[in-house]
UniProtKB/Swiss-Prot annotation:
UniProt protein name: Putative ribose/galactose/methyl galactoside import ATP-binding protein 1
SMART domains to which the protein is assigned, alphabetical: AAA
Record keywords, A-Z: ATP-binding, Cell inner membrane, Cell membrane, Membrane, Nucleotide-binding, Repeat, Sugar transport, Translocase, Transport
First-level EC class: translocase
Gene3D superfamilies: P-loop containing nucleotide triphosphate hydrolases
Annotated PROSITE patterns: ABC_TRANSPORTER_1, ABC_TRANSPORTER_2, MGLA, RBSA
Gene Ontology CC entries for this record: plasma membrane
EC number from the UniProt entry: 7.5.2.11, 7.5.2.7
Length: 524
């Protein structure tokens, strides 16, 4: 997938159509003046959307804009409070996801929920297994041969080289995402909702997905596509609708948009740069990784990071970047090699050792590994530094509150107070809370694994601004990212890995998309 934004001519005079797209023919879906309220929150306020058959309609907006709520209404998970939905010319009144599926509406959720101990085939046909009967027996039996055969046909269609009998737990997250797409295709849906479908898959798999989307379009299937990735939007969209604060902002064919205009409509303000990287003084070597190896995972990895420097760790999925970071943070053990901090060799047997030496890591999966979602903002911020607030066996709530308020102000976290439950915040604010948790400590090295995955463009800009500020304060930063624009926009140097080895190191001037991809694919 190209990381270069496709720039198209902006609309002449005006900011895009102020009503849903009304040109052309063949609307498969019309959502009119949809409202939805939750206790204390108006999630959707008169939102409208029109989608043409045989097109990809990209729905964009910052986290919290209401995109997921709108799609959950369409897919039968939520009931509407007001408005109406027309699907293939008929008014929809379904009150369940099963009814939506029966109508031909299928949704691929960003957060997967496969049955891990079942096979690929069993997951795809769960609840609608093909059956056969036997003479004299009232019960029907699952036809596993047919189910496996049909699954193999679907896998071949998408180019996936897996057996239908492979257990889901043996697949990568990326492959599980593709299996969800296979499941939607198997239902012969006439409208498929894809919520961040490429958030955890490689460029090769993205290209595979886009080819399948092209086939679906040709068959007349409508696709509502939610993504924060600008390059994807302009690569795949036929039409674009922009949401903000639960309301319709604008809609137009993708050919009438350019990135700057789209971003401005999404956030309601002008963002000067998504990558506000500034030159800051580079200091002495903080981290030195020497001949680091882990059997079967990565081999002979070496690089350095200096104070005030952001080093981008780039490579394809499976290159070993996260695995190296896990060793530096003490989550996994190396079989050979040395990790030095300020020249001193470290013995890293657990994250506790890393934290004690001033090393922090923000995981790529903030919800599973970075936050306690059911706890408050204040509790999450103080989580890694409870000793600072402890007096004997008691925690000083006053000190904890003061420190949390300081972090909220410094990182500009949008929350009404420290008592707010973290699960109810946007992805961008959740990521800031993970950062705040570590910044309370005495940090020397910060490892950021996919720091802006799944967050909107406005929040991305904020995270990037904070990274620059941390570097200015002398922090050494490792940034792992699968988004080339982010690597190119934020890195002082780029270390590229392929199949568990470092294949090259590039200065900011040398770092281009072509050079990185050449090294990431094993070239020299």
């Amino acid at each position: 997938m190209s990381a270069t934004l496709q720039r198209v001519a902006p609309l002449s005079g005006g900011e895009g159509h102020r009503t849903p797209i009304d040109s052309g023919a063949g609307f498969v879906l019309e959502m009119r003046s949809i409202t939805k309220a939750f206790p204390g929150v108006l999630a959707l306020d008169g939102m409208s959307l029109k989608v043409r058959a045989g097109t990809v309609h990209v729905l964009v907006g910052e986290n919290g804009a209401g995109k997921s709520t709108l799609m959950k209404i369409l897919s039968g998970i939520y009931a509407i409070d007001g408005g109406e939905i027309l699907f293939r010319g008929e008014k929809l009144d379904h009150q369940s996801a099963a009814a939506a599926l029966e109508r031909g509406i299928s949704m691929i959720h960003q957060e997967l929920s496969p049955v891990l101990d079942m096979t690929i085939a069993e997951n795809i046909f769960l609840g609608r297994e093909p059956t056969y009967s036997r003479t004299g027996v009232l019960s029907r039996f699952v036809d596993f041969d047919r189910m496996n055969s049909d699954t193999q046909t679907l896998l071949d269609r998408l180019g996936l080289k897996y057996s239908p009998q492979t257990k889901m737990r043996d697949l990568s997250i990326a492959t599980m995402q593709l299996i969800e797409i296979v499941k939607a295709i198997s239902r012969e849906a006439s409208l498929i909702i894809m919520d961040e479908p490429t958030s955890a898959i490689s460029d090769t798999e993205v290209a595979m997905l886009f080819r399948q989307i092209a086939d679906l379009k040709a068959a007349g299937v409508a696709i509502i596509y939610i993504t924060h990735k600008m390059d994807e939007i302009f690569q795949i969209a036929d039409d674009i609708t922009v949401m903000r604060d639960g309301q319709f902002v604008a809609a137009a064919p993708a050919s009438e948009y350019e990135p700057a205009k789209l971003i401005s409509q999404m956030v309601g303000r002008t963002i000067s740069s998504i990558f506000p990287k500034e030159e800051v003084p580079i200091g002495d070597i903080v981290l030195s990784v020497e001949n680091l190896s882990r059997d079967g995972v990565f081999d002979n990895v070496g690089f350095e990071v200096r104070a005030g420097e952001i080093v981008g760790l780039s490579g394809l999925i499976g290159a070993g970047r996260t695995e190296v970071a896990r060793v530096i943070f003490g989550l996994d053990a190396a079989d050979a090699g040395v990790v030095r901090l300020n020249g001193k060799p470290l013995k890293l047997t657990s994250p506790k050792d890393a934290i004690a030496n001033g090393i922090a890591m923000v995981s790529e999966d903030r919800k599973a590994e970075g936050l306690v979602l059911c706890r408050s903002v204040g509790e999450n911020i103080s989580l890694a530094n409870l000793k600072k607030f402890a007096s004997g066996i008691f925690i000083s709530e006053r000190q904890e509150e003061t420190a949390s308020q300081r972090m909220i102000k410094m990182l500009q976290i949008k929350t009404p107070d420290t008592a707010m439950i973290v699960e109810n915040l946007s992805g961008g604010n959740q990521q800031k809370i993970v950062l705040a948790k570590w910044l309370l400590g005495d940090l020397k090295l910060l490892i950021l694994d996919e720091p802006t995955r799944g967050i909107d463009v406005g929040s991305k800009s904020e995270i990037h601004r904070l990274m620059t500020e941390f570097a200015r304060q002398g922090l050494a930063i490792i940034m792992i990212s699968s988004e080339l624009p982010e690597i190119l926009g934020m890195s002082d140097r780029v270390v590229v890995m392929s199949e568990g080895r470092v294949t090259g190191e590039l200065t900011r001037a040398e770092a281009t998309q072509e050079n990185i991809m050449r090294l990431a694919t094993g070239g020299h």
